[in-house]
Amino acid sequence: MTGVPSSTWFSAAPHWEWLIALYFFLGGLAGGSYFLSALIDLFGSREHRPLAHLGYYVAFPCLALSGLLLAVDLGRPLRAWHMFIQSNTYRPMFKYWSPMSIGSWALAILGFFAFLSFLAALAEDGRIRWSGLRRLRAPSPAGRIIAVLGGFFGFYVAGYTGVLLAVTNRPIWSDTPLLGLLFIVSAASTSSALMILLAYRSGRTTPVVADLHRMDDWVIALELLVLIAVMVSLGPVLSAWLNVWGILLAIVIVLGMIAPLVLSWRARRFHQVTLATPALLVLVGGFLLRVVIVFSAQSV
């Protein structure tokens, strides 16, 4: 292994393509959006509730689409149910030792809670005329239970893709213990950014959105620090990014992290009305970050 930074250089790549990169991105948006909305429902005031609606509107469709992408990537979508059910006994199949199995079940369970919260948000907005659905949201007892359990699985889904990569024996992925943390922080950042954009589009630019802006700025700063820690922890494996992927990663850092922080500061400093541009940059940067991590490790 002389001259090779890590033994992971000798492993075979899983050949994950764009569908998986998009699946990672949408899964992070779904988990992060639901987790943030659950926190708002559990600890926020009444004026925060419209903002939580936006997160629930994001979580369920993103989960449905990410599940579809995962099934299509398997090559035989109609057999995706085999991830949950044993084909010979038709009993539930759960492999506690497999991050893929745990993640699949977490996606399904979060999908259940996200669907309930999605219906409740529609009912509260008057788009479904069934008042009983409103009880599926806090502060009702049932709503609190749904928010707590769904929020837990949302947090898990937001970071599990990073853990999945970490247990896959490839350069970069298994050479740092921080990918799960990076994906969690990135999911929180991109989810906040998407909720901000939807708030502007729907006209819900309340002081609560300004609070979300400030929170996202702190999360972006934390994401930058975690990414730096990832790079330091890679040691000699960092040489895998001394190519086009490293250039793209630099673009992610500049345009997806530093630029949003600068633009956000300028907007508050000079009392500008909209902060939509920084939020859009964060979203693009979050997707490209996953592209870099997924593809660079397979190109070695």
Ranges and model annotations:
Residues 5-13, 83-93, 130-136:
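Inter-helical loop and helix-membrane interface segments of multi-pass membrane transporters/permeases
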Residues 1-42, 291, 295-299:
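N-terminal signal-anchor module of multipass membrane proteins
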Residues 277-296:
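Final/C-terminal transmembrane alpha-helix of multipass membrane proteins
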Residues 17, 24-26, 43-46, 98, ...:
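Long, contiguous internal "core" modules enriched in hydrophobic/ aromatic residues
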Residues 66-69, 260, 285-286:
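Alpha-helical transmembrane segments of multi-pass membrane proteins
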Residues 29-85, 89-106:
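Membrane helical hairpin/interfacial module
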